[in-house]
């Protein structure tokens, strides 16, 4: 990690395991999030069992407050067989999506780090990597900004939107969902 693992965007993330307005996204985004929530539920249990750190997975629901396009939302909910409830919010009607789950991102990252170390995986923190120069799909060494060469059987890049900093050809090709 360029800095300490789990101390940047993953630390600040809200941990909502659902697209904020699924009715405006392609169905693949909703499908991914729906499956991810179930994965996180089970993964959280496993992390807690192995590490003693509870990532606090919880189905808290999500409230949608006006203004919103009720026709579009109802069409999406009907298509996906998703339950939506009307609730009162400051003397107006809001919508509650009761099945939406969340997780505490800082606790999740702390548990994942401990779990990976427990599995014998080496995590290198506070190390900035140089951009990848070759076009190989698989690399087994990587140069750091302070000119150290890291060798490994595999590298897992988890830089998200910052991937262009280490693989410039992906500039303008990575988008948040």
How would you name each of these model-derived features?
Residues 6, 148-177:
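Central helical "cap/lid" subdomain
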Residues 122-141:
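A conserved short coil-to-beta-strand element within the FAD-binding core of flavoproteins
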Residues 71, 130-131, 162-164:
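Glycine-rich nucleotide phosphate-binding loop and flanking beta-alpha elements
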Residues 9, 29, 134, 166-168:
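Short glycine-/acidic-enriched loop or helix-start segments at secondary-structure transitions
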Residues 1-13:
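Glycine-rich FAD pyrophosphate-binding loop
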Residues 15-93:
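Dinucleotide-binding Rossmann-like beta1-alpha1 core, especially the glycine-rich loop
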Residues 31-34, 67-70, 95-114:
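Short beta-strand to alpha-helix junction loop
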């Amino acid at each position: 990690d360029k800095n300490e693992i789990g101390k940047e965007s993953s630390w600040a993330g809200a941990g909502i395991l659902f697209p904020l307005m699924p009715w405006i996204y392609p169905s693949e985004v909703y499908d991914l999030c729906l499956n991810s929530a179930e994965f996180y539920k089970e993964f959280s249990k496993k992390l807690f069992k192995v590490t003693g750190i509870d990532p606090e997975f919880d189905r808290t629901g999500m409230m949608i407050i006006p203004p919103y396009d009720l026709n579009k939302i109802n069409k999406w909910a009907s298509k996906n067989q998703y339950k939506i409830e009307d609730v009162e919010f400051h003397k107006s009607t809001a919508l509650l999506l009761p099945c939406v789950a969340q997780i505490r991102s800082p606790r999740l990252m702390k548990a994942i780090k401990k779990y990976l170390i427990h599995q014998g995986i080496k995590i290198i923190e506070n190390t900035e990597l140089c951009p990848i120069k070759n076009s190989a799909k698989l690399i087994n060494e990587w140069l750091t900004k302070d000119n150290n060469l890291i060798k490994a059987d595999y590298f897992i890049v988890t830089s998200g939107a910052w991937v262009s900093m280490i693989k410039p050809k992906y500039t303008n090709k990575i988008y948040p969902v």
